[in-house]
């Protein structure tokens, strides 16, 4: 699921990518319920709907006409594949337990993930685009490896140990909230009313999902 968003971004829009990726927690819930018997109650369902609405409010900037004008491309299929891939990865982390601690386990996953992508990298390097190995390149690679890589994946794995696959999946809806506020902080975008509405709805949905008396463990 790591390479798919980059492929999707070549032919589809950020709005489409954001909307489609919000389906990932839904796939986590469906797969967990169908194949692993994890129960899903009514309040968790309302939490899911509330999160979805909150994310959509931010993505479409509070303007419903954004949805009417959407056009879909092959990139949307790549993004759908990324959403399903993340769902499968999340379920794998939770249901296939490992004797290894979090960091050694992540190291092995990252190693074999990089190994599986190596042939595709070589094909791209030879036939399409040569990588320029300079200071700028190594700075961005280091940032990608440390922040969204080691830190984010490790914390996500730790959260799953305590909350389960489907409940932890709801934290993905925070990405849209964080992304909006990063745009305000780093790119001088304006804070609008829809940011407040969407953020409140997302946090309300996550609160409903994570209430201890609403979480039903795998039967």
Q: What are the functions of these language-model segments?
A:
Residues 10, 59-72, 122-136, 140, ...:
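Membrane-interface helix termini and inter-helical loops of multi-pass transporters
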Residues 13, 36-41, 101-102, 164-165, ...:
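A helix-boundary/kink motif common to multi-pass secondary transporters
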Residues 3, 26-30, 84-87, 118, ...:
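Hydrophobic/small/kink-forming positions within alpha-helical transmembrane segments
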Residues 5, 24-49, 174-197:
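C-terminal transmembrane-helix exit sites in multi-pass transporters
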Residues 45-57, 74-81, 89-147, 174, ...:
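Hydrophobic alpha-helical transmembrane segments of multi-pass integral membrane proteins
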């Amino acid at each position: 699921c790591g390479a798919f968003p980059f492929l999707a971004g070549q032919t589809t829009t950020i709005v489409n990518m954001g909307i489609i990726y919000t389906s990932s927690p839904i796939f986590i819930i469906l797969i967990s319920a169908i194949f692993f018997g994890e129960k899903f109650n009514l309040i968790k369902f309302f939490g899911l709907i509330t999160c979805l609405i909150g994310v959509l409010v931010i993505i479409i900037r509070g303007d419903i006409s954004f949805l009417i004008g959407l056009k879909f491309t092959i990139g949307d299929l790549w993004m759908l594949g990324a959403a399903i891939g993340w769902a499968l990865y999340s379920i794998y982390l939770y249901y296939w337990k490992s004797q290894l601690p979090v960091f050694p386990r992540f190291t092995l996953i990252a190693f074999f993930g990089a190994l599986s992508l190596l042939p595709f990298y070589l094909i791209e390097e030879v036939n399409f685009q040569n990588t320029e190995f300079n200071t700028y390149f190594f700075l961005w690679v280091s940032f990608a490896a440390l922040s969204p890589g080691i830190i984010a994946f490790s914390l996500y794995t730790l959260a799953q140990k305590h909350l389960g696959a489907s409940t932890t999946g709801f934290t993905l809806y925070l990405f849209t909230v964080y992304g909006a506020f990063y745009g305000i902080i780093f790119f001088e975008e304006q804070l609008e009313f829809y940011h407040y509405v969407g953020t409140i709805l997302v946090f309300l949905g996550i609160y409903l999902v994570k209430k201890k008396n609403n979480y039903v463990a795998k039967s």
